[in-house]
């Protein structure tokens, strides 16, 4: 049992990245409320990057999370960035069907909490996740909004499906190696291209197409485990 109860005795380098994840999610929420939705999407994608890095840093530094502090930090941060932030975004983006997104928003948050709670109590790593990983919710809605083809009803339908898949028992593969690198490159490219449009007022000839590629890649990841398997003869 740990006798030292000082908060600093629990915190390791990966936890600082989890804090950056949570901070990005919080800022995304503020920007959505303020109506700066492109910037809110950028902050959500930035949170995904920090979330990816905290696990990588934990493995590289050989962290032994005996008391589960890091796991809980990660999950609590994820609720903010990948549960609450997407819910606030779709509500803030709604004009004609706001009442629908009032109902969809809590569904995203609650299913995200259930998904993370189950993840925390299940032991062992394995090659697959049980249920859709919650960061996918943030990547899905932010990339969809940034495509320039955002639709309130389509967003509501997609996020309902994502929420249900998070609490499903469908096995989703852990993305690592080349797949992880490609995903991170797409996310970074989307962040940079949209930021250039927002900050430099540059022409959005790149931002839209990059976001479309990221959105399609995310939908592919979501759909593949659901599609019926064909027997190879």
Curated annotation (Swiss-Prot):
Membrane topology, from the record: Multi-pass membrane protein
Give the metabolic or biological pathway: Membrane lipid metabolism; glycerophospholipid metabolism
Q: What is its main location?
A: membrane
Mention any one GO cellular component term assigned to this protein in its UniProt record: membrane
What processes does the entry annotate via GO biological process terms? glycerophospholipid metabolic process; phospholipid biosynthetic process
Protein's cellular compartments: Membrane
Keyword Cell inner membrane among UniProt keywords? no
Task: Indicate what this protein is called per its UniProt record.
Answer: Archaetidylserine synthase
The record's note on activity versus temperature states: Optimum temperature is 60 degrees Celsius.
**What Gene Ontology molecular-function terms does this entry list?**
archaetidylserine synthase activity
